[in-house]
């Protein structure tokens, strides 16, 4: 979901573990030379999803990295397969009320219409939960979510050793 804390939490956890962090949207902007809004305006949703999928393939080849994908990554089934083949998928489940109450997100166009964000959550929740290897509930404060994510990452690291 947009605004659920993927990038913020991902950066903190990657830093804590001494790993690299990639925000997939930033990667898309870097590779395309256009911001996300420009890509949507020029290519539409379908065109953006193709670019996003191509960038995900690039990112999936990287090692020892924590990735924050865009919230719509799960709308393309092949993307779920790519993510699961290249690593573990963690869904950060943040209640819509918490997303909407975060004043630092007020500039995001998608979050201006409360009805749309609830609809988006309801449309995607089953995809998020079914594609996730782990679910981190981001209900309380950021520190609690970071602690949960570090526990998840340590489990993953133990499995890989």
PLM features per residue range, with description:
Residues 1:
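P-loop (Walker A) phosphate-binding loop of NTP-binding proteins
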Residues 4:
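ATP-binding Walker
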Residues 7:
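Walker A/P-loop
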Residues 12, 16, 88, 126-161:
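NTP-dependent small-molecule kinase module
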Residues 23-82:
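ATP-dependent small-molecule kinase phosphotransfer cores
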Residues 32, 40, 52, 60, ...:
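Short, flexible helix/strand-to-coil boundary loops that buttress conserved ligand/catalytic motifs
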Residues 71-73, 95-97, 141:
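Short glycine-rich anion-binding loops that position phosphate/pyrophosphate groups of nucleotides
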Residues 86-127:
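A glycine- and Lys/Arg-enriched "phosphate-lid" helix/loop adjacent to the NTP-binding pocket
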